[in-house]
């Protein structure tokens, strides 16, 4: 037997041995490396502990997730009741044209100059992010993201084989955009884009015109994509203007905007979003992924189209409610010894620093080992909004999406918890 044959015989026996061992010990094939490095949601990973707390009869105040309690507009339910179709057929892969036309008119109200041809309806804003990354990023490509950032950006980047390069903002600066030089330092031949969320989730920060201009100049200088998540545009509280990426002149073809009806119409379960771009090549590529998933939800599109006609007084009432909740929560947090949070300018979240050793442990402890008069609080550990594992250890994200009476109770319970938490630092 020559050397090559001996090598083949050895390798074949090795493989046979491996198969026999797997069968003997009932070892299943391994999951993908992509799946193994996919981060858990900091928003949802504590749900099992929350469920167990509720089973014990504990009232859980949910400040962990952006699920508004404001009733969905009546026009949405009216549209649902009026559906009289005989067949719930596929819609076009890019969405119903009448919905895209109405979305374009809606965007015009915000000085966003697009047509229905620039709009692709997606199954939630998350699919818009996912399809954009799959269409624009190759494995090993890099995107620069200000952090803390919505955790699903990293998850979808991993799915595309891309790498998130973070630029860290700080609570001391109110989570303002870091110096643009920090972005430029990270640019390499593999850098394909910058991603922003404006107004920001999780911090509530609202980017200024000056900050947006600096991003524009960098995008133009290096010919990058500008991915812009703008689902919270309705929620800007300080009088400062909302600046869309589409307001930035000279980079119109670089901009890919993400949108959703989930937050502005309180329709998180509808799963209707949009990807908006003037870049025809990107749209054509995105459409391939849209065709592979066939169509966005038909019923959801019908309801979303009707929701665009939500009365202005509904929107104003909702806006005023969030203004009050924001002030109530921020004032209440900053009155608790050792707690600090800046004033968020938009969205309905804030990131707070707590006098604790580890936010992940604290948030789990609240649900598994603590209750005050049958109540506890659920929050999102901020570590999950950073790429680096050592950041956000003493920070949490809170969503002011419950009524003020419950916010007051949640704040009181949080104060009591911090007084007895074994890992408190003051």
Tell what function each PLM region has.
Residues 7-10, 18-20, 24-31, 35, ...:
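PLP-dependent class I/II
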Residues 86:
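Basic nucleic-acid-binding alpha-helical/helix-turn surface characteristic of O6-alkylguanine DNA
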Residues 90-123:
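Conserved N-terminal alpha-helix of the aminotransferase class I/II PLP-enzyme fold
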């Amino acid at each position: 037997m020559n050397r090559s044959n001996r090598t083949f015989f050895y390798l074949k026996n090795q493989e046979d041995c491996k198969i026999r061992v797997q069968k003997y010990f009932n070892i299943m094939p391994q999951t993908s490396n992509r799946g193994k490095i996919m981060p858990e949601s900091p928003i949802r990973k504590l749900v099992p502990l929350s469920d167990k707390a509720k089973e014990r009869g504990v009232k859980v105040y949910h400040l962990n997730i952006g699920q508004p309690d404001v009733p969905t507009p009546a026009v949405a339910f009216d549209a649902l009741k009026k559906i009289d179709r005989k067949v719930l057929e596929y819609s076009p892969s890019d969405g119903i044209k009448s919905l895209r036309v109405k979305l374009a008119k809606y965007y015009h109200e915000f000085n966003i100059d697009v047509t229905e041809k620039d709009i692709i309806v997606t199954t939630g804003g998350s699919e818009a992010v996912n399809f954009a990354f799959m269409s624009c990023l190759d494995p090993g490509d890099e995107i620069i993201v200000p952090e803390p950032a919505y955790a699903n950006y990293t998850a979808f980047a991993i799915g595309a084989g891309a790498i998130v390069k973070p630029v860290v903002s700080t609570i001391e600066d109110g989570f303002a955009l870091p110096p643009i030089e920090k972005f430029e330092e990270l640019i390499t031949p593999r850098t394909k884009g910058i991603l922003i969320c404006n107004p920001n989730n999780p911090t509530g920060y609202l980017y200024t015109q000056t900050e947006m201009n600096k991003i524009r100049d960098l995008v133009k200088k290096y010919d990058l994509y500008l991915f812009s998540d703008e689902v919270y545009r309705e929620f800007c509280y300080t009088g400062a203007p909302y600046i869309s990426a589409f307001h930035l002149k000279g980079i119109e073809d670089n901009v890919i905007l993400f949108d959703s009806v989930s937050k502005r119409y309180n329709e998180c379960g509808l799963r209707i979003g949009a990807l908006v771009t003037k870049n025809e090549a990107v749209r054509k590529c995105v459409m391939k992924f849209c065709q592979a998933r066939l169509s966005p939800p038909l019923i959801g599109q019908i309801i979303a189209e009707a929701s665009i006609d939500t009365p202005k007084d509904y929107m104003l009432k909702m806006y005023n409610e969030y203004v009050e909740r924001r002030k109530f929560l921020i004032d209440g947090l900053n009155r608790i010894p050792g707690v600090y949070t800046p004033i968020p300018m938009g969205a309905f979240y804030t990131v707070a620093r707590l006098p604790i050793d580890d936010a992940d442990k604290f948030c789990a402890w609240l649900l598994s080992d603590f209750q005050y008069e049958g109540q506890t609080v659920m929050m999102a550990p901020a570590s999950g909004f950073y790429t680096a594992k050592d950041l956000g250890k003493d920070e949490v994200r809170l969503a002011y999406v419950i009524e003020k009476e419950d916010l007051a109770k949640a704040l009181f319970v949080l104060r009591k918890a911090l007084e007895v938490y074994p890992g408190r630092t003051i």
